[in-house]
Amino acid sequence: MKTILFLCIENSCRSQIAEAFAKAYSCSANKIISAGSNPSGEVNPTAIKLMGKMGHNISDHSSKSVNEIKEEIDILISMGCGDSCPQLSAKKRLEWDIPDPKKMKEDEFVEVIKLIDKKVKKFIENLPES
Protein backbone atom coordinates (compact mmCIF):
# COMPACT_ATOMS: atom_id res chain seq x y z
CA MET A 1 0.00 0.00 0.00
CA LYS A 2 1.22 3.48 -0.88
CA THR A 3 0.16 6.78 0.67
CA ILE A 4 -0.11 9.41 -2.03
CA LEU A 5 -0.55 13.09 -1.15
CA PHE A 6 -1.73 15.70 -3.64
CA LEU A 7 -0.67 19.12 -2.36
CA CYS A 8 -1.61 22.64 -3.42
CA ILE A 9 -1.99 25.94 -1.63
CA GLU A 10 -5.68 26.09 -0.67
CA ASN A 11 -6.74 22.44 -1.09
CA SER A 12 -9.88 23.73 -2.76
CA CYS A 13 -9.45 22.93 -6.48
CA ARG A 14 -6.44 21.18 -8.00
CA SER A 15 -5.52 18.77 -5.22
CA GLN A 16 -9.19 17.94 -4.55
CA ILE A 17 -9.73 17.13 -8.23
CA ALA A 18 -6.56 15.03 -8.37
CA GLU A 19 -7.58 13.14 -5.21
CA ALA A 20 -10.97 12.29 -6.74
CA PHE A 21 -9.48 11.03 -10.01
CA ALA A 22 -6.76 9.06 -8.21
CA LYS A 23 -9.32 7.35 -5.99
CA ALA A 24 -11.35 6.47 -9.09
CA TYR A 25 -8.35 5.02 -10.96
CA SER A 26 -6.31 3.48 -8.13
CA CYS A 27 -6.72 0.18 -6.38
CA SER A 28 -8.30 0.47 -2.95
CA ALA A 29 -5.05 -0.64 -1.31
CA ASN A 30 -3.54 2.80 -1.90
CA LYS A 31 -4.34 5.65 0.45
CA ILE A 32 -5.04 8.80 -1.55
CA ILE A 33 -5.19 12.13 0.30
CA SER A 34 -4.97 15.83 -0.45
CA ALA A 35 -4.06 18.90 1.58
CA GLY A 36 -3.04 22.52 1.30
CA SER A 37 -0.26 24.68 2.68
CA ASN A 38 -2.80 27.44 3.42
CA PRO A 39 -6.22 25.76 3.16
CA SER A 40 -9.22 27.88 2.20
CA GLY A 41 -11.56 25.93 4.46
CA GLU A 42 -13.86 24.92 1.61
CA VAL A 43 -13.84 23.07 -1.67
CA ASN A 44 -14.34 25.41 -4.62
CA PRO A 45 -18.05 25.38 -5.66
CA THR A 46 -17.15 25.41 -9.36
CA ALA A 47 -14.90 22.38 -8.85
CA ILE A 48 -17.76 20.59 -7.08
CA LYS A 49 -20.19 21.46 -9.89
CA LEU A 50 -17.93 20.56 -12.81
CA MET A 51 -16.61 17.36 -11.24
CA GLY A 52 -20.22 16.36 -10.52
CA LYS A 53 -21.05 16.81 -14.21
CA MET A 54 -18.14 14.44 -14.96
CA GLY A 55 -19.49 11.83 -12.55
CA HIS A 56 -17.19 12.55 -9.59
CA ASN A 57 -18.92 13.74 -6.43
CA ILE A 58 -16.51 15.83 -4.35
CA SER A 59 -19.20 17.69 -2.41
CA ASP A 60 -18.31 15.70 0.72
CA HIS A 61 -14.59 16.60 0.51
CA SER A 62 -13.15 19.14 2.92
CA SER A 63 -10.23 21.54 2.64
CA LYS A 64 -7.46 20.25 4.93
CA SER A 65 -4.15 21.61 6.15
CA VAL A 66 -0.95 19.78 5.40
CA ASN A 67 -0.32 20.04 9.16
CA GLU A 68 -3.16 17.54 9.68
CA ILE A 69 -1.29 14.85 7.71
CA LYS A 70 0.17 12.33 10.12
CA GLU A 71 0.82 9.49 7.68
CA GLU A 72 4.21 8.69 6.21
CA ILE A 73 4.00 9.90 2.61
CA ASP A 74 5.27 7.58 -0.10
CA ILE A 75 4.59 9.94 -3.01
CA LEU A 76 3.96 13.67 -2.73
CA ILE A 77 2.62 15.41 -5.82
CA SER A 78 2.74 19.20 -5.70
CA MET A 79 0.12 20.65 -8.02
CA GLY A 80 2.06 23.79 -8.85
CA CYS A 81 2.41 25.75 -5.64
CA GLY A 82 6.17 26.18 -5.94
CA ASP A 83 7.76 27.82 -2.91
CA SER A 84 4.36 28.11 -1.20
CA CYS A 85 4.30 24.35 -0.61
CA PRO A 86 6.14 23.17 2.47
CA GLN A 87 9.02 20.73 2.18
CA LEU A 88 7.41 17.62 3.58
CA SER A 89 9.21 14.37 3.96
CA ALA A 90 8.23 11.91 1.24
CA LYS A 91 9.93 8.92 -0.36
CA LYS A 92 9.26 10.44 -3.79
CA ARG A 93 8.27 13.97 -4.85
CA LEU A 94 6.72 15.05 -8.12
CA GLU A 95 6.00 18.60 -9.29
CA TRP A 96 3.06 19.09 -11.62
CA ASP A 97 2.83 22.66 -12.80
CA ILE A 98 -0.97 22.87 -12.95
CA PRO A 99 -2.51 26.35 -13.25
CA ASP A 100 -4.88 27.38 -10.46
CA PRO A 101 -8.37 27.41 -12.01
CA LYS A 102 -10.22 29.17 -9.17
CA LYS A 103 -10.65 32.47 -11.05
CA MET A 104 -11.01 30.97 -14.52
CA LYS A 105 -14.12 30.87 -16.69
CA GLU A 106 -15.88 27.50 -16.65
CA ASP A 107 -14.56 26.41 -20.06
CA GLU A 108 -10.98 27.12 -18.95
CA PHE A 109 -11.66 25.43 -15.61
CA VAL A 110 -12.81 22.32 -17.50
CA GLU A 111 -9.53 22.29 -19.44
CA VAL A 112 -7.59 22.28 -16.15
CA ILE A 113 -9.76 19.40 -14.91
CA LYS A 114 -9.01 17.48 -18.11
CA LEU A 115 -5.29 18.15 -17.69
CA ILE A 116 -5.38 16.86 -14.10
CA ASP A 117 -7.41 13.82 -15.20
CA LYS A 118 -4.86 12.99 -17.90
CA LYS A 119 -1.87 13.37 -15.55
CA VAL A 120 -3.48 11.36 -12.74
CA LYS A 121 -4.54 8.56 -15.09
CA LYS A 122 -1.01 8.26 -16.51
CA PHE A 123 0.50 8.41 -13.01
CA ILE A 124 -1.78 5.63 -11.68
CA GLU A 125 -1.21 3.46 -14.77
CA ASN A 126 2.57 3.68 -14.20
CA LEU A 127 2.43 3.23 -10.42
CA PRO A 128 4.23 0.07 -9.31
CA GLU A 129 2.02 -2.22 -7.26
CA SER A 130 4.49 -2.69 -4.41
What are the residue ranges of the model-derived segments?
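Phosphate-binding/catalytic loops
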Residues: 82-130
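Hydrophobic/aromatic beta-strand patches that form the interior of the parallel beta-sheet core
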Residues: 33, 75-77, 94-96
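Surface-exposed loop/turn and secondary-structure junction residues enriched for glycine/proline
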Residues: 20, 24, 69-72, 91, ...
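Mid-chain, well-packed structural core segment of small domains
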Residues: 61, 66-89
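Short conserved AdoMet
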Residues: 27, 71, 128
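Alpha-helix boundary/capping detector
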Residues: 48, 76-78, 119
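Conserved active-site segments centered on acidic
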Residues: 1-67
